[in-house]
From Swiss-Prot:
One annotated GO molecular function: metal ion binding
Catalytic activity annotation: (2R,3S)-3-isopropylmalate = (2S)-2-isopropylmalate
Designated name of the protein: 3-isopropylmalate dehydratase large subunit
Species annotation: Cyanothece sp. (strain PCC 7425 / ATCC 29141)
Pfam families assigned to the protein according to its UniProt record, in alphabetical order: Aconitase
Cofactor note: Binds 1 [4Fe-4S] cluster per subunit.
Annotated PANTHER family: 3-ISOPROPYLMALATE DEHYDRATASE, HOMOACONITASE, MITOCHONDRIAL-RELATED
Known role: Catalyzes the isomerization between 2-isopropylmalate and 3-isopropylmalate, via the formation of 2-isopropylmaleate.
UniProt keyword annotation of Lyase present: yes
Database matches in Gene3D superfamilies: Aconitase, domain 3
């Protein structure tokens, strides 16, 4: 049993009661909502005659269904417009702060909360979205929840949860040029598997994470769920505090007091973990998924695995993946032709991601016939990118420059694959049909790797383009 970890400290501080079931009734400090998983929750409140208990602790935005090209209202998709109107009405009726399109702060929920300073160390955070684990980058305990749990948080500001074990994932050393945070988390998932984290919270530690920016840490924590973990986190440190300082919702008058408290909730040096796994950063290369789960990844310069050489539990899904993806065991992904390139999402739609991709795009051109587009994670990211001229770099290279939203990460808006198209994507999931076509294929990779694919027309080792 873990002891003295950040997870234990934050859990204990937010425990309201131990329920007869053995679960913990946990107070939720910050609740994030969007247009997809909240309408039914609000409807259930209305049926029971309930109000939102602490509306000031809930923040709303619209992201999943918004078009990224033409955002004029009403939306062309009537269902999307209906969901949009429902969120607007519910927020107005319950006094919930809503960052709507055109507010200057709208965007993907897991991008805007950190950039506003809403996400802070020691918090418990919930959202009706799988990738709520993103906020763990700040030393928060953040859970993705379902619609009925969204209702529970709105009504009571609590959740009934079973306490998780804690696995420490330690990565040490400096990353090689061309290797990014996305490669780190894909490497971890391919090594441990997509089910290894079930029942665990992942603590990401070691010198590699200490050297990362907050945006890089968010990329890693974002995909904790892809490794089976309910949440993932990094202990708060000077990097965390520097990011938060002077942000809109960060403490203003009692900064020193807040910083001292944040430091106190970090895992103790002698903390006891349920499990510890150690990686060497030198072993991590640019990584690309080849199959239909995020765990089916490979270093870009390595041959695809032979199913018979995989553990018995992975052989059937490997065979299924090869058939679906139309790839051959033993071959390399290098040179695989790409139809669509997508840079964005809550995993990789932040300013540092766009800078990394722009570095590759600058002075080059998207291959004719290939569709490539960049979707900033928020209106603030878009404004910053345009202030730096990144939009001009992308457009000069032949990329489309879009409005903020979840876009092609998932098939809930007009940005979708067609037929058997294969995409190079900076998003987080490569399931069958994830990007809108029942037969479409997705290769997950870093934004820089996506940009490299766009200007070469095929899976390319980004290290070959850096510095040229």
């Amino acid at each position: 049993m873990s002891k003295g970890t950040l997870f234990d400290k934050v859990w204990d501080l937010h425990t309201v009661a131990t329920l007869p079931s053995g679960q913990t009734q946990l107070f939720i400090g910050l609740h994030l909502i969007h247009e997809v998983t909240s309408p039914q929750a609000f409807a259930m409140l209305k049926e029971r005659g309930l109000k939102v208990l602490f509306p000031e602790r809930t923040i709303a935005t619209v992201d999943h269904i918004v078009p990224t090209d033409n955002q004029a209202r009403p939306f062309a998709d009537s269902l999307a417009e209906e969901m949009m109107q429902a969120l607007e009405t519910n927020c107005q009726e319950h006094g919930i702060r809503f960052y709507n399109i055109g507010s200057g702060s709208q965007g993907i929920v897991h991008v805007i909360a950190p950039e506003l300073g809403l996400t802070q160390p020691g918090m418990t955070i919930a959202c009706g979205d799988s990738h709520t684990s993103t906020h763990g980058a700040f030393g928060a305990i953040a859970f993705g929840i379902g619609t009925s749990q969204v209702r529970d948080v709105l009504a009571s500001q609590t959740l009934s949860l079973s306490k998780l074990k804690v696995r420490k994932i330690e990565v040490n050393g400096s990353l090689q040029p061309g290797v990014y945070a996305k490669d780190v988390i894909l490497h971890i998932i391919r090594t441990l598997g997509v089910k290894a984290g079930v029942g665990y919270a992942y603590e990401y530690a070691g010198t590699t994470f200490e050297q990362m920016s907050m945006e890089e840490r968010m990329t890693v924590c974002n995909m904790a769920i892809e490794g089976g973990a309910r949440c993932g986190y990094v202990n708060p440190d000077a990097v965390t505090f520097a990011y938060l300082k002077e942000r809109e919702f960060a403490p203003q008058t009692d900064w020193d007091t807040a910083q001292q408290w944040w430091q106190s909730i970090a895992s103790d040096p002698d903390a006891v973990y349920d499990d510890v796994v150690v990686f060497d950063a030198a072993d991590i290369a640019p990584t690309v998924t080849w199959g239909i789960t995020p765990g089916q990844g490979i270093a870009v310069d390595q041959p695809l695995p032979l199913p018979e050489q995989l553990p018995a539990s992975e052989q059937a899904i490997a065979e299924e993946a090869y058939q679906y993806m139309d790839l051959i065991p033993g071959q390399k992904l290098l040179g695989t032709k790409i139809d669509v390139c997508f840079i964005g999402s809550c995993t990789n739609g932040r300013i540092s991601d766009l800078r990394a991709a722009a570095e590759i795009a600058q002075g080059r051109r998207v291959v004719p016939g290939l569709k490539a587009f960049v979707v900033p994670g928020s209106e603030r990211v878009k404004q910053q990118a345009e202030a730096e001229g990144l939009d001009q770099i992308f457009q000069a290279a032949g990329f489309e420059w879009r409005e903020p939203g979840c876009s092609m990460c998932l098939a809930m808006n007009p940005d979708k694959l067609q037929g058997r198209q294969i995409s190079a994507s900076s998003s987080n999931r490569n399931f069958k049909g994830r990007q809108g076509s029942a037969t479409g294929r997705t290769l997950l990779m870093s934004p820089a790797m996506v940009a490299a694919a766009a200007v070469t027309g095929e899976v390319t080792d980004v290290r070959e383009l850096l510095g040229q």
